Amino acid sequence: MAKYLDPKADLTFKKVFGEHPNLVASLLNSLLPLPAGEEIADIEYMSPERVPRTSIGKNSIVDVFCKTKDGRKFIVEMQMCWTADFKDRALFNSAKVYVDQLEHAEDFSLLRPVYSLNLVDAVFEKDVPEFIHHYKVVHEKYTDRLIEGFHIVFVELPKFKPQSIAERRMAVLWLRFLTEINKTTERVPDEFMESSEISQAVKLVEESAYTREQLMGYDLFWDAVRVAKTLASAPERSYKAGLKEGKLETARKMKGKGFSAADIADLTGLAVDEIEKL
């Protein structure tokens, strides 16, 4: 009997959506507010790391960054814990990608929209029932009039109920895949295997597809997530301090198990020089 890993983990999420263009295209088509006739047919991956040429020197790394042949850009993020500045980060990333287009075209009319899809394993809009939140630049009074450029979507995974969007079959299947498949899965639902995209994704998260070192990193990732979630209700300053300590503790464990500084940095987001001092 096959065993499965949780697709929300950094290792598996990037394997499924960061290495298989057809799967990330299917996910984006199912969850983003794309106009009729403008669904994604072909997609190309771009480097997930972008170093802004701005005075603040802010670096940002996203999970998946890709573009279509017509120039539209797409950012996909899997966020395990909600933080107060995550919306700002999503806006910053989208704005940076939008502005960077001027490197190649000084004609503003050639600027193409940027879409940001943020999957969040936490509830952050506690006073509204909806779990999909679409932000865009609209006229305050005439909301049908908008400035094309940014579309930022947040999905609160814990609020997801299949019946609430039953008419959107692929959206339901992708969200069920993200919320139902994990190490306790004994039987994959038949409807998952009836979809070529979902069945491919299920195969990609089989535990047997990963090395011992990758599985150790997977377990350490969840250790770090547990620390972060424990601290999530703390005041922001305490939360950030605790999150940093959680990353350092994860790095110490990985270092003790023989992981390279580069691999530890990739998993934790810590700088290599910090890791070498541990």
Q: Regions from the language model: what does each represent?
A:
Residues 1, 5, 74-79, 172, ...:
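Short, charged alpha-helical interaction segments and adjacent helix-coil junctions
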Residues 1-152, 159-163:
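Accessory alpha/beta interaction modules
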Residues 16, 31, 158, 178-181, ...:
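Generic structural signal for hydrophobic core residues of well-folded globular domains
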Residues 141-148, 169-180:
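Low-complexity, glycine/alanine/valine/leucine- and proline-rich hydrophobic stretches
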Residues 155-159, 186-187:
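Short, flexible active-site loops
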